[in-house]
């Protein structure tokens, strides 16, 4: 039996309990650790080698922080010191104590970053980076063979092709993960962090200046680093302006989050996403069947110019698919062109599936992403693009109403 969460994630669970009533001490902790949070963010994204400059005074600051959240850091350090540590000289012991404290402090900073970033468009990018830098720690804990049930706990929440059980050796209830240990380690971190982020996202951040300042500073730093942030801002026919991510259905958002955080959705899920995204951008009213029930056969050039299509493909590859674990640019380009019916293959757009086919997908890997919300349950939402169109129309209606009210107020509508 192995522990699926590494030690730092266990730390996060403890911090989660300590910050349950987030308004009590969260802002004060942020205020005291603000510069360290930004330093740690820069370290994770490769722009800083350390978060500590004057360790003695900095540990004093964090001793106060741990006291605020009722965390016995000295007791924790004592537990982590080797049992025979008393044999060493005082100087050596002190050095080891400082190293342990630095690790505990870094865990706290990571947790604070997760809280903040889960309320921004950059959380997926953070998860991908974090899984990459922490994988070694997890790999060291992983044996070559693990219980099939422990394997399934992670594999069932991952869409990485290499984690399909039929591809691996299974003997006496144990899976041999020797060849895929690095991938498995990253997925342990990724799926658990995504789950943690989702839970934290449900809690509102305190509405105060220190939170706003930190979020602005994080955004200013990451907006140029994370090129695909604008992936959530596509434009649609008859609608001027960017479409917010929440206007897209949960299934599409789920696939997007998986890709951006370094996951690898199934072939069918990627195909549905690509075609949905293309139609959302150029013709969100397009559906697989016309009103007479006939299949709608169109190619990409029927709804967009070649220049627009080429730009769409380039952006999708650069902003999105480069994050996928099994990325191959040449294959990905061909695959996108084939799915939207552009220059290769049968020359017809392969439509995004109707909702009923997501729910009963016959093993295509679509049902995993089908998590209906209240809007999905409305009778007229039978296709993912219906969800988008509903939100576009709702917004346009609201804008028209605002305009009429303004004209009435100014006396221009007589």
From Swiss-Prot:
Keyword vocabulary terms for this entry: 4Fe-4S, DNA replication, Iron, Iron-sulfur, Metal-binding, Primosome
GO biological process: DNA replication, synthesis of primer
Binding site for [4Fe-4S] cluster: 251, 352, 370, 376
Co-factor binding comment: Binds 1 [4Fe-4S] cluster.
Role of this protein: Regulatory subunit of DNA primase, an RNA polymerase that catalyzes the synthesis of short RNA molecules used as primers for DNA polymerase during DNA replication. Stabilizes and modulates the activity of the small subunit, increasing the rate of DNA synthesis, and conferring RNA synthesis capability. The DNA polymerase activity may enable DNA primase to also catalyze primer extension after primer synthesis. May also play a role in DNA repair.
HAMAP family: DNA_primase_lrg_arc
One Gene Ontology cellular component: primosome complex
Molecular functions (GO terms): 4 iron, 4 sulfur cluster binding; DNA-directed RNA polymerase activity; metal ion binding
Family: Belongs to the eukaryotic-type primase large subunit family.
Cofactor(s) of this protein: [4Fe-4S] cluster
One Pfam family in the UniProt entry: DNA_primase_lrg
Assembly and interaction partners: Heterodimer of a small subunit (PriS) and a large subunit (PriL).
Domain of life according to the entry: Archaea
The keyword Lyase is assigned to this record: no
InterPro entries tied to this protein: DNA_primase_lsu_euk/arc, DNA_primase_lsu_PriL
Species per Swiss-Prot/TrEMBL record: Methanocaldococcus jannaschii (strain ATCC 43067 / DSM 2661 / JAL-1 / JCM 10045 / NBRC 100440)
Protein name: DNA primase large subunit PriL
């Amino acid at each position: 039996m192995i522990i699926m969460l590494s030690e730092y994630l266990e730390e996060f669970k403890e911090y989660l309990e300590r910050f349950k009533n987030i308004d009590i001490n969260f802002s004060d902790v942020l205020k005291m650790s603000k510069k360290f949070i930004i330093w740690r963010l820069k370290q994770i994204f490769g722009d800083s080698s350390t978060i500590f400059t004057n360790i003695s005074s900095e540990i004093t600051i964090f001793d106060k922080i741990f006291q605020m959240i009722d965390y016995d850091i000295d007791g924790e350090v004592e537990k982590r010191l080797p049992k025979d540590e008393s044999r060493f000289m005082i100087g050596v012991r002190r050095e080891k104590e400082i190293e342990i404290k630095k690790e505990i402090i870094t865990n706290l900073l990571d947790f604070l970053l997760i809280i903040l970033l889960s309320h921004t468009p950059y959380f997926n990018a953070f998860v991908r980076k974090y899984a990459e830098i922490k994988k070694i720690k997890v790999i060291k804990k992983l044996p070559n063979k693990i219980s099939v049930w422990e394997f399934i706990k992670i594999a069932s929440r991952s869409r990485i092709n290499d984690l399909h059980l039929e591809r691996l050796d299974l003997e006496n209830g144990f899976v041999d993960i020797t060849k895929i240990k690095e991938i498995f380690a990253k997925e342990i971190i990724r799926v658990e962090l995504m789950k943690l982020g989702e839970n934290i996202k449900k809690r509102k951040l305190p509405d105060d200046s220190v939170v706003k300042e930190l979020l602005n500073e994080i955004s200013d730093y990451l907006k140029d680093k994370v090129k695909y942030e604008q992936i959530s801002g596509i434009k649609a026919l008859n609608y001027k302006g960017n479409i917010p991510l929440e206007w897209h259905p949960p299934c599409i958002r789920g696939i997007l989050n998986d890709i951006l955080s370094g996951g690898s959705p199934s072939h069918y899920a990627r195909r549905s996403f690509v075609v949905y995204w293309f139609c959302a951008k150029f013709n969100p009213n397009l559906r697989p069947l016309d009103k007479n029930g006939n299949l709608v056969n169109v190619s990409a050039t029927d709804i967009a110019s070649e220049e627009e299509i080429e730009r769409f493909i380039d952006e999708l590859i650069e902003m999105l698919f480069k994050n996928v674990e099994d990325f191959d640019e040449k294959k990905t380009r061909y695959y996108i062109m084939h799915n939207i019916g552009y220059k290769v293959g049968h020359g017809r757009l392969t439509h995004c599936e109707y909702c009923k086919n997501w729910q009963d997908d016959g093993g295509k890997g679509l049902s995993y992403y089908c998590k209906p919300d209240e809007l999905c349950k409305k009778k007229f939402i039978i296709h993912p693009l219906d969800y988008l169109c509903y939100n576009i129309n709702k917004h346009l209606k609201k804008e028209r109403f605002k305009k009429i009210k303004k004209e009435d107020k100014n006396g221009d509508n007589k």
